[in-house]
Amino acid sequence: MNNGMQIFDYEDIQMIPNKCVVQSRKEVDTSVKFGPHTFKIPVVPANMQTIIDEPLAIWLAEHDYFYIMHRFQPERRMDFVRDMKKRGLIASISVGVKDDEFDFIEALAANELTPDYITIDIAHGYAQVVIDMIQHIKHYLPNAFVIAGNVGTPEAVRELENAGADATKVGIGPGKVCLTKLKTGFGTGGWQLAAVRWCAKAARKPIIADGGIRNNGDIAKSIRFGATMCMIGSLFAGHEETPGKHVNIDGKEYQEYYGSASEYQKGTHHNVEGKKILLPVKGKIGDTLKEMQEDLQSAVSYAGGRDLESLTKVDYVIVKNSIFNGDQY
């Protein structure tokens, strides 16, 4: 560990403006090339069961947003890939690392179905079994773009890249409904942005910053410190299109949002590292995505550029430190 490393999180950083070179923020290009495709913004909704389902995946793909389908209905995945291919849309799925997941990859190959993106999605992604799965996918589906995670160190990023991962997902427990940092004492909660920076310096391939993003400005900060894409859960939870269960309390509508390792997800109280919260329902997801794009356009105009590249060069100051990243526990 680098003892001289600066430790900070999103709320601790303010970026310093440069001279603006655009007449209007509408001139700013927020698109990002990630793997073989280009997307409107460098943002992907979290691959969680309370955030994404098949209809939303279709909508996102149709509107040039990146998505990753969750892995909690494994029996649906083959048909989902087939359906997306039929529609002429990108197919992007998640897999775990249990034995039957290795069989599933072979079944995809046997059916001549190659998803555009496959995300190996486990809480502690710096593991031999993840390396085995990367190599397995690359053997059977060599044209799939493989995202592996989650990790929190440069060593992990390098090993997964060397195994064949095309991108890595950085973040151990910084999410709003993730309890890993409190239950285990491990993770990047409270220093997620510094972890992104640390990992990005070692990476040769793209990084997805996953977790801890609480405001739209945090997307720009992630890009500044080396992320190509940001995975976001809580800001997307509670929309009309998101699949979390709706609850009515005193005439107000709320939606359930829970972590992928919560008892609500697992249906069991063993090895729980996630919790459930209720969020007010907040309209259409398209409006939130548009607002994210507009805020990113403004951020680029402050950076003095015309596209996302300009964010990577701005100066910044560290204003304070807070281990809980703005969440009151």
Curated annotation (Swiss-Prot):
Its EC number is 1.7.1.7. It comes from the Bacteria. InterPro entries: Aldolase_TIM, GMP_reductase, GuaC_type_2, IMP_DH/GMP_Rdtase_CS, IMP_DH_GMPRt. NADP(+) binds at residues 207-230. The keyword Transmembrane does not apply. One of its GO terms (molecular function) is GMP reductase activity. The active site is at C178. GO terms for cellular component: cytosol; GMP reductase complex. Keywords: NADP, Oxidoreductase. Gene3D superfamilies: Aldolase class I. CDD domains: IMPDH. It catalyses: IMP + NH4(+) + NADP(+) = GMP + NADPH + 2 H(+). GO terms for biological process: purine nucleotide metabolic process. Catalyzes the irreversible NADPH-dependent deamination of GMP to IMP. It functions in the conversion of nucleobase, nucleoside and nucleotide derivatives of G to A nucleotides, and in maintaining the intracellular balance of A and G nucleotides. Belongs to the IMPDH/GMPR family. GuaC type 2 subfamily. PANTHER family: GMP REDUCTASE. This is GMP reductase. It comes from Lacticaseibacillus casei (strain BL23).
